[in-house]
Structures are given as structure tokens and as C-alpha cells.
Amino acid sequence: METVDKLEAMFQKAEADIEYVEKRLKFDFMASAREAGTFEGNPVELLEDLSAIKARHAALCAQVEEIAAEQKRSMDSIRAHLDTTVQLVQQLQNTADVQVPPLTEEEQEARDALCSSVAALNVEAMPTSEPQSQAQSEAQNVHEDVSEKTFETVPRSVRGNLKLKDLNALYKQLFEHFSDKSRGPISTQRMKKLNMKVNDSALKTLQHLKLIELDKKGLVSLLAND
């Protein structure tokens, strides 16, 4: 029981640490917005902050996976030792000349408590991956405009006289179009019929930034965000 209690305490502390990091991320973001004098802030700075938060969130998810894996290994070890002990006792009862006396009431209570603890740990560990996967999926479905800094990395020979706002307008329209996962690649003519602000410079720029894919037929597909 002492080992199980220590194990539960370790997992509870890990969960508390995760909650603290999450609250700290929210607090830092709100504090940064207040220092800028507005909750909207500078769009470029907000995008940079969002990238930093996503990176910290990814690190946090990795820690959660490690904790869940360690929790599962601990439960498997406890269950294996318990099964081995029960088998040894049964083997002794079957082979020894002297029958092992039945468990006392106190021993039975200790055994039942240990089994209950293992079962409780198993129930708590199972849903860990579902909210984490959901959070990662939601993070991947968030649209981000191309920042001015990123835009400047595209050679002038590729982007020509393209303006950043026109590039982001087309990128957002494509993102919204492909939010329906059942939609396949789209042609330039189809984009024009949908009133998208499409032009060769914008498509080449998005392709250069690895945000879209152009096949040999000129059909456009949106690449998944990292």
C-alpha cells in the first residue's frame, strides 16, 4: 500500500505541475497584452507570441505523454507482481504437505485495497490521450497569417509586386475552403469562380513557403500546418 500511495502522490504532483504551467502560459499572454496597452496588441507580436505558446504547449504535451507512459508501466508492474504472488500462493497450496491457512480479515482487506488502487489507476490513465489528441488537432486547425518577417524571406523574383495583405487574403480563403476535409485539389479557374483573390505571384509565394502544393496540372492543395 505504501508503494501505491507514493505512486499516486507522484502522479498527483505531476498533474498539479501541468495545471500550473497552463495557468502560467495564460497569465503571461494576458500580461503581455496589457503591457502593449490593448488586448489586441500588435498583430506581428501576437503571432510571434502564439508561435512561442504553441511550442511550449507541444513540450507540455510531450511531458504528459511521458507521464502517461510511466503511469502505465507502473500499473503493469504492480499487476504483474500481484499475479505472480497469487500464483505462488496457489502453487504452495497445491504442492506443500501443510496447507496454507486462509487469509486473515486484515490480510484480505489489504489485498482488496491494493486491487482497488490498481483498478483506479487504470481508469484514470485511459482518457489521457483523448483530450491531448483533441488539443493537438485544434491547434493544427487554427489559421495563422503569413508574418511580414516570413514574407520578406521570399525572393523578389518569386513574389514580384505582391502585397502581404493580398497574400494573406488568398491564404485565408484557401484555408477556409479546405476546412472541409472532403474537398480535393482546386483549380485556378475554380478559385476565381469562388471570388478568391488568386494570382500567379500569390500561388508561387505560398508554394515557396510550403503552405500549398501545386501539381503538374496546376491544381492547388493546402499543406498541413506543423
Curated annotation (Swiss-Prot):
The keyword Ribonucleoprotein does not apply. Keywords: Cell cycle, Cell division, Centromere, Chromosome, Cytoplasm, Cytoskeleton, Kinetochore, Microtubule, Mitosis. It is found in: Cytoplasm, Cytoskeleton, Spindle; Chromosome, Centromere, Kinetochore. It comes from the Eukaryota. GO terms for biological process: attachment of mitotic spindle microtubules to kinetochore; cell division; chromosome segregation; mitotic cell cycle; mitotic metaphase chromosome alignment; mitotic sister chromatid segregation; regulation of microtubule polymerization or depolymerization. GO terms for molecular function: microtubule binding. Pfam families: SKA2 (PF16740). Belongs to the SKA2 family. This is SKA complex subunit 2. Component of the SKA complex, a microtubule plus end-binding complex of the outer kinetochore that stabilizes spindle microtubule-kinetochore attachments, promotes alignment of chromosomes at the mitotic spindle equator (chromosome congression) and assists suppression of the spindle assembly checkpoint. Kinetochores, consisting of a centromere-associated inner segment and a microtubule-contacting outer segment, play a crucial role in chromosome segregation by mediating the physical connection between centromeric DNA and spindle microtubules. Component of the SKA complex, composed of ska1, ska2 and ska3.
